């Protein structure tokens, strides 16, 4: 009988039962904790989907050179263009003139949050806001954008219109502002007595002409919250402004 003790197989030695080599204790710890395995960059971390494992990930979340270095190592392709957080172009940025010509700066990556800034004539700022903020509220409510009006940095004859939201919201709101300015200028060019907001029906002292239809009907747009003419509107903004036909 062989009385010699059989020694325990050393870690890393051949395992006759398993048909291979056992993993050493250090290797097992590295596998279970992730230590020693962070030798390659995490492609998920550097993608648009992101890595769901956080600090428990077995791959690198920090690589010198960032995305460009990782893309060269893993052939991930060119980096995703970043959306500009300030859509103001060179000089004054975009500008709406008195004729309603646009525009805000370059836009891309729809769905991303951004800020657009463009200039308008200061005389148009009040009409863009509307009586009691009705016009600006309508734009914000319809597009979801946040609209504010600020003083221009250099020209006191201009005001800055600032739009905050997604690029799609900003694009829609910009179109609404452009349309509003166009209608305001069109109404201002109408001769006395012609159409909404042109001053027709008003006498030289700012009173309605006898027999005019000024403020004899309720403004449907005001009832819906989207009248852009304010005090210049020919229709009554509520029962208090309503007058009988032909009565001064």
UniProtKB/Swiss-Prot annotation:
Keywords: DNA-binding, Metal-binding, Repeat, RNA-binding, Zinc, Zinc-finger. GO terms for biological process: positive regulation of leaf senescence; regulation of DNA-templated transcription; regulation of photoperiodism, flowering. Pfam families: KH_1, zf-CCCH, zf-CCCH_2. A zinc finger (C3H1-type) spans 36-64, 213-240. Residues 1-37, 87-110, 188-209 are annotated as: Disordered. Residues 113-177 form the KH domain. The keyword Metal-binding applies. It comes from the Eukaryota. GO terms for molecular function: DNA binding; DNA-binding transcription factor activity; mRNA binding; RNA binding; zinc ion binding. CDD domains: KH-I_AtC3H36_like. One of its GO terms (cellular component) is nucleus. InterPro entries: KH_dom, KH_dom_type_1, KH_dom_type_1_sf, ZFP36-like, Znf_CCCH, Znf_CCCH_sf. Transmembrane segments: none annotated. Residues 90-103, 192-204 have a biased composition (Gly residues). This is Zinc finger CCCH domain-containing protein 36. It comes from Arabidopsis thaliana.
């Amino acid at each position: 009988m062989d009385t010699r003790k059989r020694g325990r197989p050393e870690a890393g030695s051949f395992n006759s039962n398993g048909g291979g080599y056992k993993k050493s204790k250090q290797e097992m710890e590295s596998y279970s904790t992730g230590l020693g395995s962070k030798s390659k960059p995490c492609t998920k971390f550097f993608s648009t989907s992101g890595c769901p494992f956080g600090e428990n990930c077995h791959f690198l979340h920090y690589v010198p050179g960032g995305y460009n270095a990782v893309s060269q190592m893993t052939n991930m392709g060119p980096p995703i263009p970043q959306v500009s957080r300030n859509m103001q172009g060179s000089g004054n940025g975009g500008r709406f003139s008195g004729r309603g010509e646009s525009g805000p700066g370059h836009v891309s990556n729809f769905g991303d949050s951004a800020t657009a800034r463009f200039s308008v004539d200061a005389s148009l700022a009040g009409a863009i806001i509307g009586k009691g903020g009705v016009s600006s509220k309508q734009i914000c409510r319809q597009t979801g954008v946040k609209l504010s009006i600020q003083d221009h940095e250099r020209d006191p004859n201009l005001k800055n219109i600032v739009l905050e939201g997604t690029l799609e919201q900003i694009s829609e709101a910009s179109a609404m502002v452009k349309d509003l300015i166009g209608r305001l200028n069109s109404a201002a060019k109408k001769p006395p007595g012609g159409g909404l907001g042109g001053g027709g029906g008003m006498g030289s002292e700012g009173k309605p002409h006898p027999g005019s239809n000024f403020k004899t009907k309720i403004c449907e747009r005001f009832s819906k919250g989207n009248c852009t003419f304010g005090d210049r509107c020919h229709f009554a903004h509520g029962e208090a402004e309503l007058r009988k036909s032909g009565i001064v």
